[in-house]
């Protein structure tokens, strides 16, 4: 049903970029799209020019552990990136993943999609946006 619905949505809104997002099963038990390989298989099966991946680096770290390796495999089909600190979904400024290096990689690769933060700030949001620069 998921594939049929996505196929319909992609055909219904051909000028819109649609995304699907793998989410780790620890944070969202029972969520069926909890694997990047499965997400890429879905994109290949539907083969719609307006259907892309939403790459959440936090979920990649929780699902696979190898964020950069996963990114290399999926970047050609990615339209939107989300970031959040690993392992606690805090600001993407510390923790178990080197976000500054990842952002440099995105710049070097000339990534043209969206990058957004999805995390729980330690304090006021305005005080915790240094990662953007």
Sequence positions of predicted segments:
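Structural motif corresponding to the early beta-alpha repeats
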Residues: 1-4, 99, 112-122
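Active-site acidic/histidine proton-transfer and metal-coordination neighborhood
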Residues: 1-52, 62
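Acidic (Asp/Glu)-rich catalytic clusters
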Residues: 7-15, 43-47, 69-78, 100-111
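Hydrophobic faces of well-ordered beta-strands that scaffold small-molecule active sites
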Residues: 18-20, 51-55, 79-83, 113-117
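Active-site-proximal loop/turn and secondary-structure-junction residues that shape catalytic pockets
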Residues: 22-26, 57-59, 85-87, 119-123
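Distinct, well-ordered alpha-helical segments
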Residues: 28-46, 61-75, 93-96, 125-132
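Short glycine-rich, flexible loops that bind phosphorylated cofactors or substrates
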Residues: 90
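Aromatic-rich peripheral "rim/lid" segments of glycoside hydrolase catalytic domains that contact
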Residues: 105, 109, 120-133
């Amino acid at each position: 049903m998921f594939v049929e619905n996505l196929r319909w949505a992609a055909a219904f809104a051909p000028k819109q970029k649609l995304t699907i997002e793998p989410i780790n099963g620890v944070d969202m038990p029972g969520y069926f799209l909890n694997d990047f390989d499965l997400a890429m298989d879905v994109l290949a099966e539907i083969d719609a020019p307006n259907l892309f991946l939403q790459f959440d680096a936090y979920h990649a770290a929780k699902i696979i552990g190898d964020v950069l390796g996963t990114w290399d495999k999926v970047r050609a089909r990615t339209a939107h990136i989300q970031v959040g600190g690993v392992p606690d979904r805090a600001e993407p400024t510390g923790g178990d993943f080197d976000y500054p290096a990842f952002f440099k990689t995105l710049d070097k690769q000339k990534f043209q999609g969206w990058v957004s933060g999805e995390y729980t700030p330690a304090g006021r949001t305005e005080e915790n946006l240094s990662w953007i620069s």
